[in-house]
């Protein structure tokens, strides 16, 4: 009887943690919606509750941490949010080097950090890997998000933008 009860509790806890876990699309949509400090903080708190078992979860955890820098008034906190967030994204990329979504996340963060901070050293590599592989990306929504970002940024040359637009 006690064994059955323990199994039911373990099953309930597993289901509860599954329901709290955010899927890739939900994380993507929530990240795209991080337009205020409150939304960003809410996303950060929610993603902290999950145990990042997948590289994409680790990547989004790092991206939202880095994004918190945008809303912090403290320069040291801004720097540390970016540094720690980029470190998390880079660790995820080490194990999933061709995941375009992870490359996109790092590219978004690094391309928006002032160059004098020295944290934008992966921009060229990430851009190149994305440009080389975006044509074969099966996720249409992700492809559209990445293409739109690149077309509206100053990261790509006119030639690269023409290739993306076609």
Protein language model regions, located:
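Helix-turn-helix repeat elements of alpha-solenoid scaffolds
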Residues: 31-46, 78-86, 119-120
């Amino acid at each position: 009887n006690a064994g059955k009860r323990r199994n039911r509790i373990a099953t309930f806890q597993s289901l509860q943690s599954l329901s709290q876990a955010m899927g890739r699309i939900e994380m993507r949509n929530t990240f795209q919606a991080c337009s205020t400090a409150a939304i960003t903080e809410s996303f950060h708190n929610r993603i902290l509750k999950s145990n990042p078992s997948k590289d994409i979860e680790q990547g989004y955890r790092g991206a939202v941490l880095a994004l918190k820098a945008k809303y912090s008034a403290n320069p040291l906190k801004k720097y540390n949010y970016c540094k720690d967030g980029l470190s998390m994204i880079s660790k995820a990329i080490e194990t999933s080097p061709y995941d375009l979504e992870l490359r996109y996340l790092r590219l978004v963060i690094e391309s928006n950090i002032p160059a004098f901070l020295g944290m934008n050293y992966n921009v060229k590599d990430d851009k190149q890997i994305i440009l080389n592989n975006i044509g074969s990306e099966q996720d249409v929504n992700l492809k559209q998000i990445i293409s739109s970002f690149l077309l509206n940024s100053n990261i790509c040359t006119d030639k690269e933008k023409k290739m993306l637009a076609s």
